[in-house]
Amino acid sequence: MHGTDSSSDTPGQPAPSRAELLSAHAEGSISEDTILKTARDRAVDIGVGAVTPAVGALLSMLAKLSGGKAVAEVGTGAGVSGLWLLSGMSDDGVLTTIDIEPEHLRVAKQAFTEAGIGPSRTRLISGRAQEVLTRLADDSYDLVFVDADPIDQPDYVVEGVRLLRSGGVIVVHRAALGGRAGDPAARDAEVTAVREAARLIAEDERLTPALVPLGDGVLAAVRD
């Protein structure tokens, strides 16, 4: 029939927004190898989240741009983000990854081994990130990736920035909580913490930040 709206294939369902279409295109443009797909399946099996393929590709690019000799990760999960980070790091780069769950570290180690990554290139640490980070050296890391409980994001940002060398990059995943952080009516503890982390980054004159609308939001900032 002439004049009908064909923007939605499902009657009664709203057409995807431009933002949704862009996100779907970004995710669909990235392919993952068998090792990454297996690690992603294991993440589902153990009930832990994993970065999307597009976020992973962004991590790989940022790791390469930063030099990728020394990278710290808060929240190992099943090793999906670690695999992406390592793919962009230098051949002799070392990934230090922290998780409070030994099972997560075990599964991630399996993924790294399957990818042919030697044990000298990863340092897996079990413990509370707030405590472990304080033991890492100042001004020594090219990139710090935060992908853990949003409630603790402000603490991780403070410690993460301390670890960065000049030109290093801090990357915070779940920085928009899928858009909730931008909703003025949302004031729960997670949203409050994420906003505080963003404020800390925005007000730090040493940092140049950008919020990237991939996954649940990625906030990245480079240190002067």
Curated annotation (Swiss-Prot):
What is the protein's species of origin? Mycobacterium marinum (strain ATCC BAA-535 / M)
In the record, biological process GO terms are: methylation
**Per the record, which residues fall in region Disordered?**
1-20
Transferase found in the keyword field: yes
Its family remark reads: Belongs to the class I-like SAM-binding methyltransferase superfamily. Cation-dependent O-methyltransferase family.
Cite the binding residues for substrate: D147
The answer, when asked if Kinase is one of the entry's keywords, is: no
Name of this protein: Putative O-methyltransferase MMAR_4217
InterPro entries per UniProt:
Cation-dep_OMT, SAM-dependent_MTases_sf, SAM_O-MeTrfase
Instruction: State where composition is biased (Polar residues).
Output: 1-11
What Pfam family is a match, any one? Methyltransf_3
User: What CDD domains has UniProt attached to this entry?
Assistant: AdoMet_MTases
Give the enzyme class.
transferase
Provide this UniProt record's keywords sorted from A to Z. Answer: Methyltransferase, S-adenosyl-L-methionine, Transferase
